Structures are given as structure tokens and as C-alpha cells.
Swiss-Prot record:
Keyword list, A-Z: Cytoplasm, DNA damage, DNA excision, DNA repair, Excision nuclease, SOS response
UVR domain: residues covered: 208-243
Domain called GIY-YIG: residue spans: 16-95
Entry-linked SMART domains: GIYc, HhH1
Organism: Rhodococcus jostii (strain RHA1)
Key word DNA repair present: yes
Protein name: UvrABC system protein C
Length: 727
């Protein structure tokens, strides 16, 4: 692995002018291309302390073996040169918004003497005009079949065209008037091209003129009593209107714009673009790409807020529209159009918005506006595109997560990276959630074979490491780890006693070893006991301090067969106990992706429980502690008396006058109101409550479950566990 200091340019040799630079690997291949307003400032940032660089950037500079640069006069020239180099060298560390060849498009071969219309998948070629892409090929064929009665252009291949030209008879479409049959000379080449140009104008959004022309011809035919021609033109107008109905009007007539939206996570970004022409959505396109390795001041970036979004927007605009302009070529120039619309709507402006806008205007040949929609129909459409981008990223993640091969590779990769004895088939992860030390809770999620096992999820209300507005995440991690593995040790002891036929009360906690298979099966359900086995891998959300705390607890409990790691946010580093440096997994590896999913699921489960507990605390009242008094009757009491203060002054007889309230309940209400109001913890959460019905259910079901004392051991602890009803 090259040392960046070995190829760092000599001091003072890098110019301060704007320019474009490229890194090459030791074999001479270009691996990264970037631009900068000041080459010296940007390149020096790459040769700072390697440990402070973002992992993706660190990998790039340690892979490179040399760096070169080219000085330009303006930032717009730098933008153009950067695009050209990325297109020429295809660097591995640059984002590439490659055109998705799986989406079908409608192609028009304007470079042929008799242009052809056909559905196409594949790389774009010069001289061919494309409409779309569309989500389904049948949608294009349906629209094309509808329009051929109005624009009877050629759709056959070159071989079919040549054969019918030789035999002197048109194909079936020629006989049913869905082709003008240029192969047999029914129309000249110029007349056929005019039909194709009208077809392109219609799909480009210039629809009103064509409809008005057909209606005028229909009226003329009617006045001349040529009712057969008038009827055919009437049907043509109807066909055009039906085709237009398939494309809803989303913006004002005459609006030509592209609307782009982004959905990102730590590693990838989903991009969606809606192409609006003539106020109607004419096509949709999407990508899911790996994020680039540009040097970013990650210390000041809030990754959850998406602060790297402006850079992604700039990269997308330069690559996508540069490619579109190159593909348009002379064909679109002759047609009076371009691959760049008059307006581009983005979620945020790129860092060099003025230069990008000037560059886009140069590609189009006229002014292009780069805007962020703030209100109205454009804002609503941008929100729709954003939902599509978010959904695309989620679907991409689900496809990867559901793939058995990728899950197997992820588990195998984790085993190799962490030097484990076997693949971690059971992974548990802990996360802490609180707001300034209040309502401190933890979650424990379980993944088996790379998939979530939601029936084994657990919530914890932090007791020892929190309270009075204080919170210690490291101590909270230690507390949850201790509670989870104390339960495991007790369960192992009970199961061993049951398997040996001994009295469970005479068995103390075990050491976390393996069980006989029959001991791990619940005789009542026939299913494996939920926590009969320890995890192969115990993950904590955090860095070295959190990992050290969890590891110390396991050592204290004598558990030696559970590996502990920590996954730090932002840099996505894997921390191992006793190691000074973290393990860096490749950013595109399935192993890191699985660990991120586990960590993110623990975060989601913890924050959902925290919000539920905080909401209960903020809306708690003295009436909450009255047994048998539910939500409906509490509301009835407050509504009847007007306030809790007036209810406190009422007599038993006055309270029983409220429908559904008996004497015993009335006395319990007065007793509760006369005593000190209980805290939220008294009526709060149950310990170790399973997530039985998916996310968010455990919070609701755990409210009345008594807490389990942490300090109990042996038979007393077993009895307490049985009283709580927790498995």
C-alpha cells in the first residue's frame, strides 16, 4: 500500500489557480478525478494526517501512487474538464451515474433515410432520439400503438423494410393504415420524415398545435361533406387526447423542467429524476450509486442532516447532463431541442451553483435556471420525486438484505475480519436513547442468519446509570450488558438443572457454556427458548469506551464465548476490545452493510421506546396509578368535574354519579389524589418486554409489567422472573 508522503508534491509546486487533478495508482491507472477553485488548498488537504481523513478518502490516497493536475482559467472550464476526464478514464473512486440500460425507452432513428420507431434497451447512440425511460415496456407499446394511427411511421427493422421493398407489398401495418408504407413508395422520404417529426413534437410536449391542426382539417372535411375523412380525423383527435390522458398535467403548460431528488445513507445515494415537458411528466429515471470519496470536513458535517447533499447534486448535474448533451449531438440541435431543459429543480443548490448554471446554459445553447422549489405545484412535484427516491433506496436495501447469498457472504466476511471461530449466526446489538439524561432507555435487537428476529427484541429502562437528569452512556451499556447476561446465566443454570433432573432451586448461575439440544427446547411449545443460547457476536453502538465496558462485564460474569465489538457512527469503524486501532471494513462490503442494519435497527427500536416513555411521562397524572381506571373512564371523570383539582374536592357519592364509576373505584381515586403523585417510573415500562407484534408494540404492552430487580440472583431472581411473566 503506497504511503501518500512518497508522492506528495514538493512544497510550493502546486499552483493556487483553479484546475482539475487526477490521482493514479502505481500501475498508472486513473482512480480519482476532482476539481478545485484552488489546487494547492485542495491537494494539501489530501496529504494531511491520514488518520483524520474520511475512510473512503483514506482508501483512495493510500491506493494512489501519483497525482497530476491541469490549470484552467475559469471554474466553468474546470467543470467541463472534470466531466471529460471522468468520462474518459472512468475512475473507480468517482460516482458514476451510468444510464440504467434496464429501463425501456422509445427510440427514433433520425439518422436514417426513413426513420424508425421502436422500443429499445441498451446504451445510447448518436443520431437516435430517445423518449423515456418508462417503467414498463408495455406502457410504451400501448402508447405507440395508439399514436401510430395518427403518425403512421415505420416501425419495422432494416431487414423487414428491405424485403417488402423487394416484393413490392407492405406489411400488415401498411394495410391497416398504421404505417405509411415508405417501403413501397406510398410516401416520399421527405413526407415520411415530416410524419416522424410531428410524432417527436407530440412526445416533446408540443401537443396543442397538432391537435388544433387536426381539428381544423376535420372541420374543413365536414364542410366539404367528406364525412369519411372527417370521421377518421375525429378518431385521430380522440387517440391523441387518450394518449395525453395517460400523462397527467403536473405543471403549467409549456413548462420544461427536470425535477431531481436524493435519498442518502452513510454509503449510498438514490437519485430520482422526473422529466417534465410541456407541463406533463414524460419520463422517469433512477439510480442507486455509491457515494464519492471527496475530501469533506466531516467534523463539521451532520451526516443525518445530509450535509454532503450539495456535493452529490453537483456531481449528478455535471455527469448526467454532460452525458445527455453528448448523446443529443446534432440530431437534437436540428430538432431545436437539447438534452438539457430550461429549468432544473433540485433539493439544494450545489456549492458552485453559478458556475454549474453557466455550464448547463452552454450545453443547452440558451439560459438554464437552477432552482430549489419553495411553494406551489413545483414544490409538490419535488416532494413526490423525493418520496420516489426514498422508496427506491428502501427497496434497494430490502433486495440486498433479502438475498441469501449476500447474507451468507456478510456473515463470512464478519468472521474473517474479526477472526472469529465461526460465522456469527446470532448477533445482538444494544443502543441507548435519551434526551439530556431524561427517560434513558436501551434496546436490544437480535439478528439470526442475517435477518431480524423481532420476537427476541427487548427494551430496558436504565436504572442505575441514569436519573436526576444525568446519563452515562458507557455505564448504561454496562448495565444493559450485565442484565442481559445475568438472565442468560440464570436460564442456563435452570435448564441444566431441568436436563439433569435436579431441583432448580439448588442450581446457581452457569458459565454461559453450550446446552444439550433437548434442554434448549421449551417442552410446552416445542420451540427453542428465546435466550437459551448466547449471541455469537454482541454489538454495542459506540466506540472504544463502550466496547471496553461491555467486555469488562462479560469478563466479570465469566462469559468467554461471546465476541464484543462496537460500531462507531459517521466513520463506521469497528472497535474490538484491547485493540488501539479499529477494524476498517470496505465501504461496499456486505459485512459492513449487515452491521449497519443491526445498529440502525437497534437505534430505531430504542428511540421508539424512548418517545413512548417520554410521551407517557409528559401526559401522566395521579389518576394513571388507579387500578381498573382506564383511559375512557379517566376522561369521563375529568370531563364531568372539569379538572383534577375539582375531582379531588368531590365526595364518593359525587364521583359514583359518573357513569361506570363504582364505590371502590371512587375511593381509590380519592386515595390516589390525596397521596403524593407517582413519578413516571411507577407506571412506566416493564423490563425485558418482548416485541411480539413488530415495531412499536412492546412499548404499549410493557406498561403494567413490574420491573425485575437487577441485583437478585439464584432462586430469588428466578422467582422474580416468573412473576414478571417474561420468558
Amino acid at each position: 500500500m503506497p504511503d501518500p508522503s512518497t508522492y506528495r508534491p514538493a512544497t510550493g509546486t502546486i499552483p493556487v489557480d483553479p484546475g482539475v487533478y487526477k490521482f493514479r495508482d502505481p500501475h498508472g491507472r486513473v482512480i480519482y478525478v476532482g476539481k478545485a477553485k484552488s489546487l494547492r488548498s485542495r491537494l494539501n488537504s489530501y496529504f494531511a494526517d491520514v488518520s483524520t481523513l474520511h475512510p473512503r478518502t483514506r482508501q483512495m490516497v493510500t491506493t494512489a501512487g501519483s497525482v497530476e493536475w491541469t490549470v484552467v482559467s475559469t471554474e466553468v472550464e474546470a467543470l467541463q474538464l472534470e466531466y471529460n476526464w471522468i468520462k474518459e478514464f472512468d475512475p473507480r473512486f468517482n460516482v458514476r451515474y451510468r444510464d440504467d440500460k434496464t429501463y425501456p425507452v422509445l427510440a427514433v432513428t433520425l439518422n436514417e433515410e426513413y426513420p424508425r420507431l421502436f422500443v429499445y434497451r441498451g446504451p445510447r447512440r448518436k443520431g437516435v432520439r430517445y423518449f423515456g425511460p418508462y417503467s414498463h415496456a408495455w406502457a410504451i407499446r400501448e402508447t405507440l400503438d395508439l399514436l401510430l394511427r395518427v403518425f403512421p411511421a415505420r416501425t419495422c427493422s432494416a431487414g423487414v423494410f428491405k424485403r417488402h421493398n423487394q416484393i413490392g407489398r407492405p406489411c400488415l401495418l401498411g394495410y391497416i393504415d398504421k404505417c405509411s408504407a415508405p417501403c413501397v413508395g406510398r410516401v416520399s422520404a421527405a413526407e415520411h420524415r415530416k410524419i416522424v417529426e410531428d410524432f417527436c413534437d407530440f412526445l416533446s410536449g408540443r401537443t396543442d398545435r397538432l391537435v388544433r391542426q387536426l381539428e381544423a382539417r376535420m372541420q374543413e372535411a365536414s364542410e366539404e361533406l367528406d364525412f369519411e375523412t372527417a370521421a377518421r380525423l375525429r378518431d385521430d383527435v380522440g387517440a391523441l387526447r387518450r394518449a395525453l390522458e395517460k400523462q397527467a398535467v403536473v405543471l403549467g403548460d409549456g413548462t420544461d423542467a427536470d425535477v431531481a431528488a436524493f435519498a442518502t445513507d452513510e454509503l449510498e445515494a438514490a437519485v430520482q429524476v422526473f422529466h417534465v415537458r410541456g407541463g406533463r411528466v414524460r419520463g422517469q429515471r433512477g439510480w442507486v450509486v455509491e457515494k464519492a470519496g471527496d475530501v469533506i470536513d466531516w467534523a463539521s458535517v451532520d451526516s443525518e442532516a445530509g450535509s454532503d447533499l450539495p456535493l452529490l447534486v453537483e456531481q449528478f448535474l455535471t455527469q448526467f447532463y454532460g452525458e445527455q448533451a453528448a448523446l443529443s449531438g446534432a440530431t437534437d440541435q436540428e430538432a431545436g431541442t437539447s438534452g438539457v431543459p430550461r429549468e432544473v429543480l433540485v433539493p439544494v443548490l450545489p456549492p458552485d451553483a453559478e458556475q454549474v448554471q453557466e455550464w448547463l446554459s452552454g450545453l443547452r445553447g440558451s439560459a438554464v435556471r437552477l432552482r430549489v422549489p419553495q411553494r406551489g405545484d413545483k414544490k409538490a412535484l419535488a416532494e413526490t420525486v423525493q418520496r420516489n427516491a426514498t422508496e427506491a433506496l428502501q427497496q434497494h436495501k430490502l433486495r440486498r438484505a433479502g438475498d441469501f447469498t449476500s447474507r451468507s457472504a456478510a456473515l463470512q466476511g464478519i468472521q474473517e475480519a474479526l477472526d472469529l471461530d465461526s460465522a456469527p449466526l446470532r448477533i445482538e446489538c444494544v443502543d441507548i436513547s435519551h434526551v439530556q439524561g431524561t427517560d434513558v432507555v436501551a434496546s436490544l435487537v437480535v439478528f439470526e442468519d442475517g435477518l431480524p428476529r423481532k420476537s427476541d427484541y427487548r427494551h430496558y429502562a436504565i436504572k442505575e446509570a441514569a436519573g436526576d437528569g444525568r446519563s452515562d452512556d458507557v455505564a448504561s451499556i454496562a448495565e444493559v450488558t450485565r442484565r442481559r447476561f445475568l438472565r442468560h446465566n440464570r436460564d442456563v443454570g435452570v435448564l441444566r438443572a431441568e436436563a439433569a433432573g435436579a431441583d432448580a432451586d439448588q442450581v446457581s448461575g452457569g458459565d454461559g457454556g453450550d446446552l444439550a439440544p433437548e434442554a434448549a427446547i421449551d417442552p410446552q411449545t416445542g420451540r427453542p427458548r428465546r435466550f437459551a443460547y448466547p449471541p455469537n457476536l454482541f454489538v454495542v453502538d459506540g466506540g472504544a469506551p463502550q466496547v471496553a465496558a461491555a467486555s469488562a462485564v462479560l469478563d466479570e460474569l465469566g462469559i468467554t464465548d461471546v465476541a464484543v465489538i462496537g460500531l462507531a457512527k459517521r466513520l463506521e469503524e469497528v472497535w474490538v476490545p484491547g485493540e488501539e486501532d479499529p477494524v476498517i471494513l470496505p465501504r461496499t462490503s456486505e459485512s459492513l452493510y449487515l452491521l449497519q442494519r443491526v445498529r440502525d435497527e437497534a437505534h430505531r427500536f430504542a428511540i421508539t421506546f424512548h418517545r413512548s416513555k417520554r410521551s407517557r411521562r409528559m401526559t401522566a397524572s395521579a389518576l394513571d396509578s388507579v387500578r381498573g381506571l382506564g383511559e375512557t373512564r379517566r376522561k369521563a371523570l375529568v370531563t364531568h368535574f372539569g379538572s383534577v383539582a375539582r375531582l379531588k374536592q368531590a365526595s364518593v357519592e359525587e364521583i359514583t354519579a359518573v357513569p361506570g364509576i363504582g364505590t371502590a373505584t371512587a375511593k381509590a381515586v380519592l386515595t390516589a389524589l390525596g397521596a403524593e403523585e407517582p413519578s413516571a417510573d411507577v407506571v412506566g415500562v416493564g423490563d425485558d418486554e418482548p416485541d411480539r407484534n413488530g415495531p412499536g408494540t412492546a412499548e404499549r404492552n410493557g406498561a403494567d409489567i413490574p420491573r425485575e430487580p437487577v441485583e437478585q440472583h439464584g432462586p430469588a431472581a428466578q422467582s422474580a422472573s416468573q412473576r414478571t411473566g417474561v420468558e
